[in-house]
Amino acid sequence: LVIFIRHIDMVLRIHNLLVALFCAWAFGAAAHGGGQHGIPKTIAKQKFTENKGQWVNQIRFEAAMPNGKLLLENNAFYYFLYDANDISKIDHPGHTKDGAITVNGHAYKTTFQNANSLVNVNGRNSSTHYFNYFLGNDPKHWAGKVKQYEQVYYEGLYKGVDLSVYANEQVPLKYDFIVAPQAEVNQISMRIDGADALRLKNNALQIVTSVGTVTEQKPYAYQIIDGKKVEVNCEYVLNGNELTFAYPKSYNKNYALVIDPNVVFSTYTGATADNWGYTATYDNQGAMYVGGYVNAFPPNGSFYPTTLGAFQTIWGGGTGGNSGNGNGIAFACDMGISKFSSDGTQLVYSTYVGGTDNETPHSLVVDNAGNLIIYGVSYSADYPTSQNAYDKTVNGLGDIVVTKLTSDGAALLGSTFVGGSADDGINFDPGEFTAGKLKRNYGDQNRGEVNIDLADNIFVASCTKSSDYPVSIGALQSTFGGIQDGCMFKLNADCSQLIYSTFIGGSEDDACYSLDLGVNGTLYVAGGTMSTNFPTTTGALHSTYRGGLYDGFLAHINVDGTQLLQSSYIGTSGNDQIYFVKLDNLGDVYCVGQTTGQYPVFNAPYSNPNSGQFILKTNPALSTTVYSTVFGSGSGSPNISPTAFLVDTCQNVYVAGWGTNSGSFAGFANNMFNMPLTADAFKTTTDGTDFYFFVLSKNAQNILYGSYFGGNGAIEHVDGGTSRFDKRGVIYQAMCAGCGGNSFTPTTAGVWSPINQSNNCNLLGLKLEFNLAGVAVEIDASPRATGCVPLTVQFDGTVTNAVTYFWNFGDGNTSMQQNPLHTYTDTGTYTVMLVGIDPNSCNVSDTAYLEVEVRDDSLTANFLPDLVVDCDSNKVA
């Protein structure tokens, strides 16, 4: 599957909007989000993906076609097609796994008879972005920096005959034969195997299959003579299953001849593959990373058919029809990971990660070196792991997986399983679309979070149903509490060592959803519990169960995972859970959750009484409430499922989430009408299934921002996972949007894909800047911060919200410019300081530092000349 993306800036009153629409172009059909019909659109220009070992050797290039794939071999085209109606049955959000589904398919092959076996097949007009494939656990079949091309050219298919394969916006596939002067055109002969029937109608070839009819339009042939295009009368000749060309009026053999058929998949016009939105993050350069569920039908790595003609695949909810694992992933899928430039104009890479069964990404984070870390779940025994992985073997049903990719996404730096013999990392009652126990919002089964410390050690908060889940010696809870426990663990930077791991839970269902690092490597964890005996500590806010079906919890763990420093229930007599926890720069603890009770409003001037979302701030010891408040519509029930959370440097609190009243999410309705809005809201109305963004000022004094985001009828949502705000308060939000094949979700002009080019859901990336986090500065040096004396450096002060700038270059010189040019005339290492100032901002100023190294490139000979023979003959010996 191929994901195409683009973003653009739109400057509003207090925020910038970047929107990216992620379009998969292959197969699928009915909407994952509600069965609505899309607006008319042109066909996405086809691209051809090279084979660098990720597929079987005979495939040279692959292209996604409507409801299938086209495989290009040296001497053949292989068409692999599925029935659109069958695919639509499995790609629907309301479909519970109520049994296996039969998916009808058809494969046929066009062979160029007696063609040159040594033909040179190459791609032309390559993409700037690339794809990485980590499919299965055999590194021989991993491929990095796989390019796409607009054209595949067969040089010397026959003697004097070349073949060009390409596409345009009107037709999904075109191929031209280019016949050189004096070459024999009658060499061209194609044999079509596997079709139910072949027939000529009005000089067009109809290839009848069990899932529809493919039409190759009347061939168009021409020559360029004296600079003018001269059409040549050309016809198909069909003899059994052999296809050739005839020229009733002949042609001038002294000039090249081009034969140009058009292939029209008239039966396969509407259906494309699902790419559901799960998780997003950022790096220090503002690049955006998104992860999602990529519908892997046909199964990854196994789409090469062994027989031609009609076939059936039994779809049971897992790749290859594996429906017996009881997992909570209804449809076959791999992880799809993409990186985009900070302005959204470039797709940097897309990476596929998975094995022969199901995978989903739940949380992403970028480490201090710019490498991407993925936390997710895999049901594949052959999920890709690294050579020195902590655990290279799947342990039971679904396991937690942690995978680290290089900054270019082209190689694995580490990858491991973590789990026991039952399900790990999935918070669910069986059934993808069933509410129950702690799974109260659609997508709650895919919660959990990954984060890092300054040494790039990896921390994960999740859950497990495995009594034999691996725990470390001396863990704070070494035994399984029962049914489902929360769990947390720490890996080293390359995933080769499990530094610590522990259960946390009681006798009922428990789950960890979020974590943040405290002082000196301690860990704060938050989640939900149904256990009245969940471990708590004396002196914490609430050491006993608060009531209702479930409570939230906050826990503080020591640096080696051996001691519960503080732990507290959080909730009311109703139903409560905490979905995110964050610390401010003073170490105070903040959390956001849902409630059906009357969560107390304390020391908070701003609140929306009787609302279903609460924000709590406590001291680091979890013993004192600093403030607590509620926000929402005042309906008495939760309105949104939280997806991202932040406390910025000014102690403003940011919340992102989505709600739905749609029948597409039966049992998960969160009425999001009448949410608090501000005058500068991006959108002030909702169709009932949209995203919502909320910013609360320091000490809960007031609402700073409230807005909906979405299109009318677009059914925006996420299918689980975390998105993130960066430290400046910029949201990087993954969405599942355009469901039903529509383009109703707003995008901005010039984006990579301004419309949804599928007839299904696609992952949409939103980057929204609120400009509320006070002054923030960074330093960039161009062309570089090291060099030889004299060294001239162009400094770029990347500043948010500053009005005054002060530079100290470390050599006694200063500047008040925002982007000064400075020359160093002496060698040495200089510490450059930039201070950005705005007296009216919440934090007044911010400071950044950068080291500049200036060297001397002159050479001094460290030897003496040796006098040989006489004074007229100095030689260096």
Where are these regions (language model features)?
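Surface-exposed loops/turns
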Residues: 181, 789, 826-827, 871
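Surface-exposed, flexible coil segments in extracellular/virion-facing regions
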Residues: 804-823
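A short beta-strand segment in extracellular, disulfide-stabilized domains
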Residues: 790-799, 873-877
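Bacterial Sec-dependent N-terminal signal peptides
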Residues: 1-36, 834, 842, 858, ...
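A sequence-level/structural motif corresponding to short, flexible coil/turn segments enriched
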Residues: 105-116, 170, 253-788, 801-806, ...
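Short beta-strand segments of immunoglobulin-like
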Residues: 781-787, 864-871
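Residues that cap or anchor secondary-structure elements
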Residues: 11-14, 30-272, 279-282
